[in-house]
Amino acid sequence: MKNLSETEAEVTMQENVVHESLPQIPVATSVSCCFVLAVLYVGSLYIWSTKHNRDHPTTVKRRFASVSMVMLAAPFFVYFFSSPELLSRVPFPKLLGLRLEGLWQAVVIPYSLTVLLFLGPIFVNMQNESVRSYFDLDYWRGSFGSIIWVRNHVIAPLSEEFVFRACMMPLILQSFSPLVAVFITPLFFGVAHLHHIAERLSLGVELSTALLIGLFQFIYTTLFGFYSAFLFARTGHVMAPILVHAFCNHMGLPDLQDLWQQDLWRRVVAIILYLAGFVGWMFLVPLATDPSIYDNTLYWNA
């Protein structure tokens, strides 16, 4: 059996092979492009002059239009600033994680893996009978008829993952190794969510409270960004982080207050499932995201 140092050496060597196989572009170029993309995405949310809050239908519709324009513009950054050698040997859609090879695996496996992570919260929701609504046709009609639901479950995951993963990761991966890239792009993603501080201040929230909430939001969006970027690099598919993002938006952060309001036996079972889900997720992440499962030899070699 191989000892830990030998395994780590193999991983490092493998990572370097993948990194060196991608033609390189200057760090300043890739980072600058990502910075501009982040500014464009956030800036597009505020180009409209409005007195309404972010949940007003008019505001939501205008922001749909704005981020759609950014989604159209973002691929041009990848096309014009990527290495010509890379563009000549790899189909452009593949760079963006748009390909058919390994697609069904990218749809099913990362999503199932994330469901495992939320095993505890799902159990708590089942005790509140909220799961039954998922089998009600009226629930889905109402959901797709709600512009807020569509924003949170469709537009936000689609636009954010396409811009911050499909269009940033290909650039960053041409300047950094996969593991480093996974930890860089989420910082842009986390910082991009700090604009909510200004929104809260405009609603009359105290500065200290707005900053505290903003810091907390930066932390959890950045942590999610690590996971999402990891999925993109390992699977080579943008669909994986899009679906996982939508699911996480639906679940939200675990409601610990709801957990402690459960009966004792349900609370014990829920805590066990919280721990089992997390441990199982940690154990399965490297196995379930093995690049060979997804025919991914571009960003992270098997």
Curated annotation (Swiss-Prot):
It holds the Pfam family Rce1-like. It is an enzyme of class 3 (hydrolase). The chain crosses the membrane at residues 27-47, 64-84, 104-124, 171-191, 212-232, 236-256, 268-288. One of its GO terms (molecular function) is metalloendopeptidase activity. The record marks 245, 249 as: Transition state stabilizer. It is a multi-pass membrane protein. GO terms for biological process: CAAX-box protein processing. Coiled coil: none annotated. The active site is at 160 (proton donor/acceptor), 193 (proton donor/acceptor). GO terms for cellular component: endoplasmic reticulum membrane. It is found in: Endoplasmic reticulum membrane. The keyword Transcription regulation does not apply. It catalyses: Hydrolyzes the peptide bond -P2-(S-farnesyl or geranylgeranyl)C-P1'-P2'-P3'-COOH where P1' and P2' are amino acids with aliphatic sidechains and P3' is any C-terminal residue. Its main location: endoplasmic reticulum. Keywords: Endoplasmic reticulum, Hydrolase, Membrane, Protease, Transmembrane, Transmembrane helix. Its EC number is 3.4.26.1. Protease involved in the processing of a variety of prenylated proteins containing the C-terminal CAAX motif, where C is a cysteine modified with an isoprenoid lipid, A is an aliphatic amino acid and X is any C-terminal amino acid. Proteolytically removes the C-terminal three residues of farnesylated and geranylated proteins, leaving the prenylated cysteine as the new C-terminus. Is able to process K-Ras, N-Ras, H-Ras, RAP1B and G-gamma-1. Belongs to the peptidase U48 family. This is CAAX prenyl protease 2. The gene is Sras.
